[in-house]
């Protein structure tokens, strides 16, 4: 098991880097912004802001009275545990392991928010004219990119039937 763990070090480092970058960025925003304050970075395209999300992506279940905090905590920990196990058992090729590590780091970054603040801290706001993409954070970005990598890994290796 120790050789398996040591050969996977780069994935644990990636997950930890995602958590650290996410938490540092949220600390910087929480230290610099008032709730709902917005600062334009790229005119008509990108702002930094501070908003709280008690739900999931796109504020899914945000207005449900609080139970969703525990649901998303359990879900994130369960998915992360499954992905850790999958990495350790070599159930993914390199691309999939990289994606899994990114998902783990992002999920645990948001878990930390839920435990400390009771909600997730979001601050990246992209928009065009009257269209706004929901505010999100670095952890969400790691989760999304990780999911794309995992899907690509699955598509590529489903075709050739082997892991690399």
Swiss-Prot record:
Listed InterPro entries: Peptidase_A8
Membrane topology term: Multi-pass membrane protein
- Catalytic residues? 122, 140
Q: Does the keyword Cytoplasm apply?
A: no
Catalysed reactions, semicolon-separated: Release of signal peptides from bacterial membrane prolipoproteins. Hydrolyzes -Xaa-Yaa-Zaa-|-(S,diacylglyceryl)Cys-, in which Xaa is hydrophobic (preferably Leu), and Yaa (Ala or Ser) and Zaa (Gly or Ala) have small, neutral side chains
GO CC annotation, single: plasma membrane
The EC category is hydrolase
Coiled-coil residue windows? none
Pathway(s) per entry: Protein modification; lipoprotein biosynthesis (signal peptide cleavage)
Record flagged with keyword Hydrolase: yes
GO term, biological process aspect, one: proteolysis
A Pfam match is Peptidase_A8
- UniProt keyword terms in alphabetical order: Aspartyl protease, Cell inner membrane, Cell membrane, Hydrolase, Membrane, Protease, Transmembrane, Transmembrane helix
Q: GO MF terms on file?
A: aspartic-type endopeptidase activity
Q: Where are the transmembrane segments?
A: 11-31, 41-61, 64-84, 92-112, 132-152
Q: What does this protein do?
A: This protein specifically catalyzes the removal of signal peptides from prolipoproteins.
Q: Which family does it belong to?
A: Belongs to the peptidase A8 family.
Q: Spell out the protein name for this chain.
A: Lipoprotein signal peptidase
Instruction: Give the species.
Output: Neisseria meningitidis serogroup C (strain 053442)
Q: What gene, per UniProt, encodes this protein?
A: lspA
């Amino acid at each position: 098991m120790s050789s398996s763990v040591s050969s996977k070090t780069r994935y644990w480092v990636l997950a930890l880097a995602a958590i650290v970058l996410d938490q540092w960025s949220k600390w910087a925003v929480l230290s610099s912004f008032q709730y709902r304050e917005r600062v334009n970075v790229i005119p008509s395209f990108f702002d930094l802001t501070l908003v709280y999300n008690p739900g999931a992506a796109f504020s899914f279940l945000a207005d449900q009275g609080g139970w969703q905090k525990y649901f998303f905590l359990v879900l994130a920990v369960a998915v992360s545990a499954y992905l850790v196990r999958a990495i350790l058992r070599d159930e993914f090729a390199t691309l999939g392991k990289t994606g899994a590590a990114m998902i783990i780091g992002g999920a645990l970054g948001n878990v930390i928010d839920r435990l400390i603040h009771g909600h997730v801290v979001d601050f990246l706001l992209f928009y065009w004219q009257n269209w706004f993409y929901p505010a999100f954070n670095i952890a969400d970005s790691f989760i999304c990119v990780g999911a794309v990598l995992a899907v690509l890994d699955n598509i590529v290796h489903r075709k050739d039937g082997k892991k690399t």
